[in-house]
């Protein structure tokens, strides 16, 4: 069993050192116990450990402003995980689009959006769907990088296009040049 880690190395209970070649998930890609992260966590532990999202904190406000000014602008919603962020995105899309009778969300083959039912349904990989019974309705899948296929899937009932800009499930898949801009254009043309 592993008992500690530092940078790219981990140690087991017997003191054996191993080079950790696993890329990790989003929260683990900085290595094991990187100094600046450890110090920031120590500092935060002396201030606030956890508050529910019904409370506002100064740091949250600063992060929300930084995210909003560097992205699409508007509001920010903080979550505990990528799955929770994707579930919130699905709900917000449905909430906004239901009055327009839109519900369909286009996702991409090879994607991974999480392990809850909605996020698993958004994940366009049959191996994650096996044994789950009926999945959440309203998801359709397009080949990653194929703008023409996406355009064919868009209809009056389409509410959103959901994409990992760079896919990481089973390797790193970078979209072809112009693909993300093309998706933005398709979305804008179809409200």
What are these regions (language model features)?
Residues 1-6, 26, 43, 186-190:
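Conserved PLP-binding active-site segment in aminotransferase class I/II-type PLP enzymes
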Residues 5, 110-167, 171-185, 189:
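PLP-dependent aminotransferase-class I/II
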Residues 7-9, 75, 104, 138:
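Conserved beta-strand and immediately adjacent loop positions that scaffold enzyme active sites
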Residues 9, 29-30, 140-141:
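Short, well-ordered beta-strand elements within core beta-sheets of diverse protein domains
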Residues 17-106:
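Glycine-rich loop-to-alpha-helix module at the N-terminal edge of alpha/beta enzyme cores
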């Amino acid at each position: 069993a592993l008992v500690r880690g530092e940078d790219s190395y981990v140690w087991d209970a017997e003191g054996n050192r191993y080079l950790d070649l696993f890329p990790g998930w989003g929260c683990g890609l900085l290595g094991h116990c990187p100094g600046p992260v450890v110090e920031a966590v120590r500092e935060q532990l002396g201030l606030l450990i956890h508050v529910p999202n019904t409370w506002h904190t100064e740091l949250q406000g600063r992060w929300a402003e930084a995210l909003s000014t560097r992205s699409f602008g508007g509001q920010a919603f903080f979550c505990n995980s990528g799955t929770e962020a994707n579930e919130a995105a699905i709900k917000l899309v449905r909430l906004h689009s239901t009055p327009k009778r839109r519900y369909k969300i286009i996702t991409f083959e090879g994607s991974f959006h999480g392990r809850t039912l909605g996020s698993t349904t958004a994940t366009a990989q049959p191996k994650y769907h096996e044994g789950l019974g009926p999945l959440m309705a309203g998801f359709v899948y397009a080949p990653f990088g194929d703008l023409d296929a996406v355009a064919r899937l868009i209809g009056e009932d389409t509410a959103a296009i959901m994409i990992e800009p760079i896919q990481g499930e089973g390797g790193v898949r970078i979209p072809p040049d112009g693909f993300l801009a093309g998706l933005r254009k398709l979305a804008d043309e179809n409200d």
